[in-house]
């Protein structure tokens, strides 16, 4: 089973950016299989919508390092771990810029990028970037079309509702062909259908506590059905599970969630956000926790 960890990107860690390189290097030395970033712009004073699955807007989202910059640092200081995003909010970005950033990081890392994308959920963040939230689904779909075009063969050309690219040359392509694997987060029927029709895999999320396999298996049943309807092989779709933690969670509890996901939901790749809700208070603390999680999981 592959085990990874989020880079120290949010909250107090954002004020110590040197920790990104330090954690990435040491996580690789311990044998971590993947390193991950998220994508947040701001923490509203009076949020209209709270973080999915919670009743609050996490305070650590008040400070967040740029995900592309953090992944670039990790790409440069490591040689083996996969480098993923969970998730980049695709509708915020002009596809040529998103395609270029991910292709560049894939080049710098020697082909280790996992492009984890989502539709977004914060109305305040959508307003901040000037994108109508009501268009997020259609923009997301067009973004996926455009990424495939920009990462494909030259000449590149795209004509859509939101973006248009006249025929031209884009010679910086991802090392991975036809592009980095695209994994999507999804919480709605439409989102799950999108995963089945368009993606290489699904990015569910859980928190430590009693693990319920249907958190993974329920959506995957709908996703695989959508894949079959689209003429795709449903068994080719992967699952990478995100485990969000919070202060007070035990290392044994975290490892138990990962192991139950492996044994009861056939999850073969999971990553743990040790800095979510301030479980790890420093890079040294995060390294210690990561090492203990790795030891517990690999012992079983």
Predicted region positions:
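Active-site-adjacent structural elements that line small-molecule/cofactor binding pockets in enzymes
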Residues: 1-300
């Amino acid at each position: 089973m592959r085990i990874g960890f989020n880079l120290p990107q949010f909250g107090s860690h954002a004020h110590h950016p040197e920790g990104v390189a330090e954690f990435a290097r040491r996580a690789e030395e311990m044998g971590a299989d993947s390193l991950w970033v998220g994508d947040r712009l701001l923490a509203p004073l009076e949020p209209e919508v709270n973080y999915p699955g919670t009743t609050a807007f996490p305070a650590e989202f008040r400070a967040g390092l740029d995900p592309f910059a953090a992944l670039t640092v990790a790409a440069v200081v490591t040689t083996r771990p996969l480098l993923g995003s969970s998730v980049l909010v695709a509708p915020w970005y002009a596809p040529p810029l998103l395609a270029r950033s991910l292709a560049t990081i894939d080049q710098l890392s020697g082909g280790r990028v996992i492009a984890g994308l989502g539709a977004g959920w914060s109305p305040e963040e959508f307003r901040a970037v000037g994108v109508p939230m009501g268009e997020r689904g259609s923009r997301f779909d067009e973004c996926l079309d455009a990424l495939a075009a920009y990462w494909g063969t030259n000449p590149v050309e795209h004509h859509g509702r939101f973006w248009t690219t006249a025929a031209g040359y884009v010679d910086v392509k991802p090392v991975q062909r036809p592009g980095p694997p695209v994994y999507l987060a999804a919480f709605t029927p439409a989102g799950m259908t999108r995963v089945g029709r368009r993606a290489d895999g699904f990015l569910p999320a859980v928190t430590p506590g009693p693990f319920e396999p249907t958190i993974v298996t329920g959506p995957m049943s709908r996703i695989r059905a959508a894949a079959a309807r689209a003429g795709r092989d449903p068994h080719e779709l992967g699952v990478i599970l995100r485990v969000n933690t919070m202060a007070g969670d035990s290392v044994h509890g975290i490892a138990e969630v990962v192991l139950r996901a492996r044994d009861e939901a056939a999850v073969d790749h999971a990553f743990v956000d040790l800095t979510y809700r301030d479980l790890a208070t420093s890079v040294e603390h995060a390294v210690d926790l990561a090492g203990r999680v790795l030891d517990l999981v690999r012992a079983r």
